Swiss-Prot record:
Disulfide bonds join C105-C180, C340-C343. Its main location: membrane. Detected in olfactory bulb, hypothalamus, olfactory tubercle, brainstem and striatum. The chain crosses the membrane at residues 35-57, 68-90, 107-128, 147-170, 187-208, 315-337, 347-369. Residues 224-247, 287-306 are annotated as: Disordered. Dopamine receptor responsible for neuronal signaling in the mesolimbic system of the brain, an area of the brain that regulates emotion and complex behavior. Activated by dopamine, but also by epinephrine and norepinephrine, and by numerous synthetic agonists and drugs. Agonist binding triggers signaling via G proteins that inhibit adenylyl cyclase. Modulates the circadian rhythm of contrast sensitivity by regulating the rhythmic expression of NPAS2 in the retinal ganglion cells. Keywords: Biological rhythms, Cell membrane, Disulfide bond, G-protein coupled receptor, Glycoprotein, Lipoprotein, Membrane, Metal-binding, Palmitate, Receptor, Sodium, Transducer, Transmembrane, Transmembrane helix. This is D(4) dopamine receptor. One of its GO terms (cellular component) is postsynapse.
Length: 387
């Protein structure tokens, strides 16, 4: 049971050997189908994900923390379409026979591992970012620096997972040059655990906690807004003072809202802020107004999540669900072949789950178009400008 056969070892481009699809397919039958399907897939991935990147870069309304990660995810899919899919399609057209150099095969394996891992890690990074924004708002930075650092970390970790392949791990004695696959079973297990089986449960747990916290926050905000509504008297009698506005003084205009907590007021001229009439009763009313403590006001501002961010978050469960549907079969087959060399896995099944995984790279722009009205309108605007 050597490690040089693609039917004995799983790889992120598993089954690239003469036995994977029978004899060389060339441009007849399966080879022609692979060529047409591959060209269409590459075109869809390039067009859709380029549109995502251009739209976010050109439209300020889309430049949100969540969409920074979506651009990073689109970049991983674009690199996959440029660096991996052409060679994958070439191998499929040849019936699974690798006719190029072993060194190019190792580079292909490393890029495939890195980009697949980067996609998963970017989804995990989104879950971490949203979890912090909802549950620890005081520590959340909306300016983008933390998000960019998190994105950089995802790419560095992805490169670290893939680096052993280009550092000689695939150079084993008796290697078959007609087969392009990962030659080390231990590394197959290691990369599968690091790239999929470990981050996916963590990501799902964080998303569950995030949306649970968001529902609680919105319910509390709704209750607080209703409790602050001023009560108007329904009949004759002295006016009822609003506990949130302080004592009632008929000679005074209503107090300026959030004068101490609004950051925009700090830029107004003093003359503008002092133009309301004043009287001794007004001074007394202002002194009697209950002021919330400063840390509490900062906490309310920090916990606020914009409507645009909430819209961006609604599409995330669909993106994660599509990713899991497309990649889970591949990784299950992938690790099964590594842990059970005696188990027979149909080469056509291996090819099918590999294609399914790559199809995911074309799905995300379609998901954004269907489930996010803001992305949809910007896509239309961008296409009109380019056409």
């Amino acid at each position: 049971m050597g490690n040089s056969s693609a039917t004995e070892d799983g790889g992120l481009l598993a089954g690239r050997g003469p036995e994977s699809l029978g004899t060389g397919a060339g441009l007849g039958g399966a080879g022609a189908a692979a060529l047409v399907g591959g060209v269409l897939l590459i075109g869809l991935v390039l067009a859709g994900n380029s549109l995502v990147c251009v739209s976010v870069a050109s439209e300020r309304t889309l430049q949100t923390p969540t969409n920074y990660f979506i651009v990073s995810l689109a970049a991983a899919d674009l690199l996959l379409a440029v660096l991996v899919l052409p060679l994958f399609v070439y191998s499929e057209v040849q019936g699974g026979v690798w006719l190029l150099s072993p060194r190019l095969c190792d580079t292909l394996m490393a890029m495939d591992v890195m980009l697949c891992t980067a996609s998963i890690f970017n989804l995990c990074a989104i879950s971490v970012d949203r979890f912090v924004a909802v549950t620890v708002p005081l520590r959340y930075n909306q300016q983008g620096q933390c998000q960019l650092l998190l994105i950089a970390a995802t790419w560095l970790l992805s490169a670290a997972v893939a680096s052993p392949v280009v550092c000689g791990l695939n150079d084993v004695p008796g290697r078959d040059p007609a087969v392009c696959c990962l030659e080390n079973r231990d590394y197959v297990v290691y990369s599968s655990v690091c790239s999929f089986f470990l981050p996916c449960p963590l990501m799902l747990l964080l998303y569950w906690a995030t949306f649970r916290g968001l529902r609680r926050w919105e319910a509390a905000r709704h209750t607080k807004l209703h409790s602050r509504a001023p009560r108007r008297p329904s009949g004759p009698g002295p006016p009822v003072s609003d506990p949130t506005q302080g004592p009632f003084f008929p000679d005074c205009p209503p107090p300026l809202p959030s004068l101490r907590t609004s950051p925009s007021d700090s830029s107004r001229p003093e003359s503008e802020l002092s133009q309301r009439p004043c009287s001794p009763g007004c001074l007394l009313a202002d002194a009697a107004l209950p002021q919330p403590p400063e840390p509490s006001s900062r906490r309310r501002r920090g916990a606020k999540i914009t409507g645009r961010e909430r819209k961006a978050m609604r599409v995330l469960p669909v993106v994660v669900g599509a990713f899991l549907v497309c990649w889970t079969p591949f990784f299950v087959v992938h690790i099964t072949r590594a842990l059970c060399p005696a188990c027979f896995v149909s080469p056509r099944l291996v090819s099918a789950v590999t294609w399914l995984g790559y199809v995911n790279s074309a799905l995300n722009p379609i998901i954004y178009t269907i489930f996010n009205a803001e992305f949809r309108s910007v896509f239309r605007k961008t296409l009109r400008l380019r056409c």
